[in-house]
Amino acid sequence: MQQVITQTLVDDRFIQISDSKKSEGLATDSTKRQSQEQPIHDKDPIKAATAAMATTPLVKEHQDTWYYPPDIANDLQSINLPAELKGEIFACAWEYTRCVIPNYTNWNRYVAFMRIIIMGIIAEFRGEMVDVTASNNLLGYDLDATLAALFEGTPGHKEMAREYKTFLLITADKASERRDGELFRRYVNALAQSPRHWFRMRDCDALARFTIASALACNDLDDIWFTEDQFEILTEIGDTLYDAVAFYKHRAEGETNSTFAYMPEDLRIKAYSECREILWALDAAWARNPKLANVINFVRFFGGPIHMMMRRYRFVEENLTIGKSETDKVVDQTRKNFKLWNRVDANKRSVLNTQRYKALIARSEELMFPGLAEFLEMGGDGICDKCKYRESTVQNCHTSLVVLNYAANADYRGEST
């Protein structure tokens, strides 16, 4: 393991502390100044203490030391990002990998998965740096070679390559100015077609089936694969659990792919409870099949515990609580990419860029999971008279989000709104 950097968050500013300063304790300019301004001698110690308290701001300090294996320490060498930010990205990728795939037998595949997650993290908050349509070289990685390092020899190699490229395509558009274009407009509108379409699109956005496939690959379980129906069930359970816990995080981010943004609040608790029960039932049913433990481990950790164990989430900052409503400060920090979060603010314009969109549809067998092109074509302009959609005009007053009502009204997963 390698210690990378220590950061302290003071009033939303990162202060790097050198090893020599660590032994001396934290001393920012403001605290030094306060100690100089306070009287050295005072006949009334109570008065002096009161004065000191009055001049000392209530600052919540939080210090992180990043750890990750040396295999990824020299990645992103040619990428223009601050060293401390790279350290946080590497640590986030390592922590996520350890949480969702806690067991592994193939270290090389495990490292490839970390690199996949590194690319994904950057796509989520620096979308302009990632364009899967332009080149196979992303952030200094050979994308196809990295995917091959993870999946070569598995039954899902080609399928998972398309899955991940779809994730990069949509996620990077969402986190960049490209979200003003025709592709993302249609993507957001298409979310409303049906619950089944919603969960398939959310599955890709969360890399849910991709991580299940990765867990199998990292444990050399190349003889196991799931049917489409099985993937849908597993990912719907995992995404429902995750989105229920991440509800306020998603709200702080203005996240379009948040299941419970589109249904009555009381359904969030009920859905989480039922999916958790199903997860434990499935776990018990598969208990004597150790090969399937890797799949259950992913769904279990993804469904909640990562919010406590990963430093990407605010469990420590919010006094060891989960499910705390976002504040203006949290939203502001999200805009500044604190904890690698990203705010998708509503846009007041939409760019009619149909040429790029048509070119991407033509490459859908390379850049989109099976069925997504049809989702975009069928539902890109909206199919429900009760929903509000982004219009395809140069200037409009609609937000970047589509307001859905399917989850509250649909009685079964295949029903359209």
Curated annotation (Swiss-Prot):
Name of the protein this chain belongs to: Alpha-ionylideneethane synthase aba3
Main EC class the enzyme belongs to: lyase
Assigned keywords, A-Z: Lyase, Virulence
Gene giving rise to this polypeptide: aba3
Phenotype reported upon loss of the gene: Impairs the production of abscisic acid (ABA).
Function description: Alpha-ionylideneethane synthase; part of the gene cluster that mediates the biosynthesis of abscisic acid (ABA), a phytohormone that acts antagonistically toward salicylic acid (SA), jasmonic acid (JA) and ethylene (ETH) signaling, to impede plant defense responses. The first step of the pathway catalyzes the reaction from farnesyl diphosphate to alpha-ionylideneethane performed by the alpha-ionylideneethane synthase aba3 via a three-step reaction mechanism involving 2 neutral intermediates, beta-farnesene and allofarnesene.
Molecular function GO terms recorded: lyase activity
Keyword Phosphoprotein appears in the UniProt entry: no
GO biological process terms, semicolon-separated: abscisic acid biosynthetic process
Gene induction: Expression is enhanced at 60 and 90 minutes after the addition of the ABA precursor mevalonic acid (MVA) to the medium, but declined after 120 min.
Pathway field: Hormone biosynthesis
EC number: 4.2.3.-
Statement: the UniProt record of this protein carries the keyword Hydrolase: no
Native species: Botryotinia fuckeliana
Family: Belongs to the alpha-ionylideneethane synthase family.
